[in-house]
Amino acid sequence: MAAKDVKFGNDARIKMLRGVNILADAVKVTLGPKGRNVVLDKSFGSPTITKDGVSVAREIELEDKFENMGAQMVKEVASKANDAAGDGTTTATVLAQSIITEGLKAVAAGMNPMDLKRGIDKAVIAAVEELKKLSVPCSDSKAIAQVGTISANSDSTVGELIAQAMEKVGKEGVITVEEGSGLQDELDVVEGMQFDRGYLSPYFINKPETGSIELESPFILLADKKISNIREMLPVLEAVAKAGKPLLIIAEDVEGEALATLVVNTMRGIVKVAAVKAPGFGDRRKAMLQDIATLTAGTVISEEIGLELEKTTLEDLGQAKRVVINKDTTIIIDGVGDEAAIQGRVAQIRQQIEDATSDYDKEKLQERVAKLAGGVAVIKVGAATEVEMKEKKARVEDALHATRAAVEEGVVAGGGVALIRAAHAIAGLKGDNEDQNVGIKVALRAMESPLRQIVVNAGEEASVIANKVKAGEGSFGYNAYTEEYGDMIAMGILDPTKVTRSALQYAASIAGLMITTECMVTDLPRDDKGADMGAGGMGGMGGMM
């Protein structure tokens, strides 16, 4: 086991604080509308330019092991805030730095660290309650666009795009961000249920100019099995041909004789058919087939529940207004499913989301909800160069997380004002002893730090502006972008309550632990030179063979 380097008391805390400051100083230059970019060197490819706090934090590793421990703990603050709300990472880092700096000063002055931590925790619990009182619901497109704009570094086109996307697919809909091919940002909305499976044979194509298949008012056969024998399909095909409608077959697979016969029938115009594989694998495939069945008012033909293909009738088939199939995707538009049944299915999947433990499962279930409930919107980010594209895509993703958080828990006045109002409301809070009172003061002072940092980044005098904002009431604050005072909510400067709350809670949680640190232990650096000499001495062993 390697020898350890151990530091105690003030020595340990000074080292830790130095690491905290290096990381926080690198992150906090990005805060606010006039925050700057940080350039990150990559071991391969071109450097990345970012204004995203958590991206900067993740890149920082320090040479000194004790300083690095301090930096890594603050990195954890940024990561936790990012995981919880998807934004607010820089705010969380600034809050943590302030609590740690002020807290360690109090420890050096002889206060009890445990009571300081209790005081900080009391203040944060009270402040979170105040934030909830200050919060207003975020329901209309205008507010959503404003939240998106602020989070995307005052880029109003991004805010507008996100608001449009949410309007089209609903607040629960899936919105994804992709790299576009042009210079302009674009919004693509896929109405209806889309899944990533294309046609099984190009001979089904009936729109050669687009290389796709379009079926108007088709019947939809859903089979949870491989279909290779045409005989078991004949009754259904005959019934569909009599009805004079096209047929879409969604099955585990359609192969061999069955596929060949379907192709021949289609080419001769006897019956218009298209076949695609069912989406997903294993249990997820069964669930998605059931989703399609609910959407189209059909029945999944599965031997598990005693249904056979030979005995399938038109009543078992689903229906939709239109189906479009190309090489890679199938879109079912306007299924005839009963609205109540669809909502019931959505509620069932939502319950599974609550119970899901892995992020991957949650994401897949969320996609299923969106496909049933509204549709999928894709924001395609446009830029002139790859470096700009990556930076912009990261900003759009941040803005999207922020708007989702705003819809979830509402919004408060932005620009650090909400924290100042919350701090003012709990200024009379008292702890059980004097040390706890100092802890409360540390937290209250820290709650001013995001506003101060926004002002510093805008090149103004922090104390003057902070005092003027503190003297105001409600959502009165300072707009660093236009350099004027006013009602932040009226000016459209909004922060999601969830983002502000998460930033404060995670910053206080980790900063409180760091204040109570009395000893730090790390591995001593190994003397590689000595190790090499030892290994070199073994060279003579070869002669022993």
Swiss-Prot record:
| Nucleotide-binding keyword on record | yes
* Enzyme nomenclature, EC number: 5.6.1.7
- Function, as annotated: Together with its co-chaperonin GroES, plays an essential role in assisting protein folding. The GroEL-GroES system forms a nano-cage that allows encapsulation of the non-native substrate proteins and provides a physical environment optimized to promote and accelerate protein folding.
Q: Fetch the Gene3D superfamilies from UniProt.
A: GroEL, GroEL-like equatorial domain, TCP-1-like chaperonin intermediate domain
Annotated positions binding ATP: 30-33, 51, 87-91, 415, 495
Task: Print the keywords alphabetically.
Answer: ATP-binding, Chaperone, Cytoplasm, Isomerase, Nucleotide-binding
Q: Which GO terms describe its cellular component?
A: cytoplasm
Where it sits in the cell: the answer is: Cytoplasm
Q: What is this protein called?
A: Chaperonin GroEL
Kindly state the subunit structure of this protein.
Forms a cylinder of 14 subunits composed of two heptameric rings stacked back-to-back. Interacts with the co-chaperonin GroES.
A single GO molecular function term of this UniProt record: isomerase activity
Asked if the keyword ATP-binding belongs to this entry, the reply reads: yes
- GO:BP terms for this protein? protein refolding
Which reaction equations make up its catalytic activity?
A: ATP + H2O + a folded polypeptide = ADP + phosphate + an unfolded polypeptide
NCBIfam families noted in UniProt: GroEL, PRK00013.1, PRK12849.1, PRK12850.1, PRK12851.1
Q: Which family does it belong to?
A: Belongs to the chaperonin (HSP60) family.
Q: Which domain of life is it from?
A: Bacteria
